[in-house]
Regions:
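Multi-pass membrane proteins that catalyze or facilitate reactions on polyprenyl-/lipid-phosphate substrates
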Residues: 2-49
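Extreme N-terminal leader/targeting segments of oxidoreductases
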Residues: 37-61, 79-80
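Glycine-rich flavin
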Residues: 52-53, 57, 75-82, 87-231, ...
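N-terminal Rossmann-like FAD-binding beta1-loop-alpha1 element of flavoenzymes
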Residues: 59-86, 236, 244-253
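Rossmann-like NAD(P)H-binding beta-loop-alpha module
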Residues: 227-271
Length: 271
């Protein structure tokens, strides 16, 4: 209403820059943001009303998941002297270190070199068909993972001031986390803040017969392929996202016959 009133007062171009009109439009712009914050606050208060907030807290923050997001969150909290507990049920480093970024880039490097050898004539060199041990290629992948592991280890983060618990966390209420330790015991911690960085897992499509096909996922193929002596002759890669596309290209360059299947209109649809 105020903006409309100020607009009605304009009788020249100079009036557009009047303090009153500018202030009116500023208020018009920020009002929805303020209203949303107030509404969200009211909704949150109603939701939280069903639980009793602790008077004292065991921790300032509990982080669930020791992947990239969880490690960074816990490190920053510890750096500002917060009392932080990091809970991880499986491997420290999460998807990036163990199943995604690190192993995929390692095998991409080997595959790129094999590809360049085949096409060395483009660089003025004699092209050659690469001869290699697939077991050695996979061993290199795992060696690189092991070389990086200490940077994401329990010992390192404990040294940084993070309380690391290996176990499975369940959120009891907005301020309480129950932890089933891998050792078998169960404990509870109250905390001011909870960071959920539990990550995700590969989606297995409900295809007829897939459960009995012996399929692999991006989580399991690294260990399973490390047991093989020879490169797989044929592969079907379901999925056209980053991991699927990286694996399809890498194994094709190493010499496998690869078929990539994507449900969408194109691969890398989010890129």
């Amino acid at each position: 209403v105020n903006a409309g009133t100020e607009l009605a007062k304009i009788d020249s171009l100079a009036g557009i820059l009047s303090p009153g009109l500018i202030l009116s439009f500023v208020l018009l712009g920020i009002f929805p943001l303020i209203a949303k914050k107030v509404t969200d606050k009211i909704k949150a208060r109603k939701v939280y009303a069903q639980w009793t907030k602790p008077v004292k807290f065991d921790r300032n923050m509990v982080v669930i998941g020791a992947g990239a997001a969880g490690l960074v969150s816990s490190y920053i909290a510890a750096a500002v002297k917060a009392k932080v507990t990091l809970v991880e049920a499986h491997k420290m480093g999460g998807d990036c270190l163990n199943f995604g970024c690190v192993p995929s880039k390692a095998i991409i490097k080997s595959a790129k070199l094999a590809h360049q050898m085949r096409h060395a004539d483009k660089y003025g060199l004699h092209a050659a068909t690469p001869s290699f041990s697939f077991k050695a290629v996979m061993a290199r992948v795992h060696d690189i993972i092991k070389a990086i592991e200490p940077h994401d280890s329990v010992e390192r983060y404990t040294g940084l001031g993070v309380d690391v618990i290996q176990g499975y966390a369940t959120i009891v209420d907005p301020w309480t986390v129950e932890i089933k330790h891998n050792s078998g015991e169960t404990s509870r911690l109250t905390t001011r803040s909870i960071v959920i960085a539990a990550g995700a897992q590969p989606v297995v499509p409900p295809l007829p017969g897939i459960e009995t096909s012996g399929y692999l996922t991006s989580d399991t193929l690294w260990d399973e392929f490390a047991k093989r002596d020879d490169l797989p002759k044929r592969l079907v890669v379901l999925g056209g996202g980053p991991i699927g596309s990286e694996l399809a290209q890498a194994f094709a360059r190493l010499g496998s016959q690869v078929t990539q299947v994507e449900l969408g209109d194109r691969i890398m649809v989010r890129e």
